[in-house]
Amino acid sequence: MTTEPLFFKPVFKERIWGGTALADFGYTIPSQRTGECWAFAAHQNGQSVVQNGMYKGFTLSELWEHHRHLFGQLEGDRFPLLTKILDADQDLSVQVHPNDEYANIHENGELGKTECWYIIDCQKDAEIIYGHNATTKEELTTMIERGEWDELLRRVKVKPGDFFYVPSGTVHAIGKGILALETQQNSDTTYRLYDYDRKDAEGKLRELHLKKSIEVIEVPSIPERHTVHHEQIEDLLTTTLIECAYFSVGKWNLSGSASLKQQKPFLLISVIEGEGRMISGEYVYPFKKGDHMLLPYGLGEFKLEGYAECIVSHL
């Protein structure tokens, strides 16, 4: 049992639509087209690494495989979540993700992908694509084949602080000028439906996955309803943004100090603004914007001090 938070070093991904905004978190980014920060990642395409304590140098996958007590002895062959920060300097492709059953059959045992977005920042008039207007699979197929994207896709204006739940089967895309934190199932399976006819670094059109997309898109497209809950704990305002079968995600606004107890199998904390410190036992752990902490099972009582905004997630 450990009574210390585990700080993780993220993995960065260059993307055709990425930019430089992730540098504002204090990160050293690999290029001017850095699109993704994989903050908590235990996937074959990216592994975040512990930066402190007795588990320093371990990947998240290694902790899950060999130190399951840190996660309350949860079952499963892989860590269940993946947390990212996305910098959309340009529009992301219009895409959809499969559910677990479809992905297991068609993607060699991969998980499906239900996700959610918290809008950290965005340009004025920024928008996302969130759902579609087709009423039947036949209409959906026809509109895709004809390239009737303006008629098919639903566009939604966004502002900082907005939150969107994106279940598998939902047509979606993050638009230009948006910085978002994404919590998702631990999957990297994406079916690209439309990519604005963009070309990659070699001058080739990026691959589309029309057949699979049409098979997994939910018709009709009905936005998921979710209820937001608030709780004040001393100087900490906690907001529950979503609770679903795959994860629970919330926001913490710290404006002073608060005493808490870690009672989940694990708790993931991403600091998106401000700074402070966590006190656990006799030890003090400073944190700042851009830090990502995993609070393991059994950590017990701890105290937060400072002024910060965090996105937190757990099962």
From Swiss-Prot:
Binds 1 zinc ion per subunit. Its cofactor is Zn(2+). Zn(2+) binds at H97, E115, H172. It comes from the Bacteria. InterPro entries: Carb_Metab_Reg_Kinase/Isom, Man6P_Isoase-1, Man6P_isomerase_Firm_short, MPI_cupin_dom, PMI_typeI_cat, RmlC-like_jellyroll, RmlC_Cupin_sf. Keywords: Isomerase, Metal-binding, Zinc. SUPFAM superfamilies: RmlC-like cupins. Signal peptide: none annotated. Disruption phenotype: Cells lacking this gene are unable to grow in minimal medium with mannose as the sole carbon source. They show impaired growth in rich medium, and impairment increases in the presence of greater than 1.4 mM mannose. The active site is at R192. GO terms for biological process: carbohydrate metabolic process. One of its GO terms (molecular function) is mannose-6-phosphate isomerase activity. It is an enzyme of class 5 (isomerase). Its EC number is 5.3.1.8. It catalyses: D-mannose 6-phosphate = D-fructose 6-phosphate. Induction: Up-regulated by mannose. Is under the control of ManR. Is subject to carbon catabolite repression (CCR) by glucose. Forms part of an operon with manP and yjdF. Belongs to the mannose-6-phosphate isomerase type 1 family. This is Mannose-6-phosphate isomerase ManA. It comes from Bacillus subtilis (strain 168).
